Amino acid sequence: MAKRSWMAKGLSASRPMTGEMGHEPLLVAFDFDGTLTVKDSFNAFLKWRAGPRWSFGVLRLTPALIAYVFDRNRGKLKAAAVRQFLKGATVAQIENDARAFAEAFAPSLLRPDAVAVWRGWRAKGAKMVIVTASPDLIVAPFARGLGADLLIGTRLRCSDDGRILGGLDGNNCRAKEKVIRLREVFGPDVRLTAAYGDTSGDTEMLAIADEKGYRIFRGKPA
């Protein structure tokens, strides 16, 4: 129960934390999926939200999955998944669903050892940033629960009246795009005190960190 209460703090907020911040002496960036969590949160969210429609939706994604085998373009595959499972939903609906998902699954998704390191940096007064390839709308409730100062994630294309159009607004936030997005906020000479990741998509972010943590978290939720 304590884990659920801790995760629920701040989940009533309605917007991802994507505003500008001033540079601080201690700046720490964490990847989300596989680093702070034990598995991909976006796939888990889509499956949970789709319910019995999940299998049919995946079947309809077959052409995109086959294309990925050849081009290895994660952004194209993610855009196809957004079109299949989220297109037409309102941003408000997705935000509400993301909050419900975080409240239900944070205790079974978050790595306890990663959260402990996160809290350790926070106790030192570091500015804490999550930089993720998952959509910012989906990760925002987790980021708020963790007390993140900033969330940088993949943005979804939305209409002026607040509906998901399908596809991505800009590039998939992985690899060099993570550094590009960090520089947009903190300037071209940004340097991270520490960074943590678990895939090749985090290499560029780790390269601008003084302390690099690659696949160092192995903890499983109780």
From Swiss-Prot:
Coiled coil: none annotated. SUPFAM superfamilies: HAD-like. It comes from the Bacteria. Disulfide bonds: none annotated. NCBIfam families: HAD-SF-IB, HAD-SF-IB-hyp1. This is Protein CicA. It comes from Caulobacter vibrioides (strain NA1000 / CB15N) (Caulobacter crescentus).
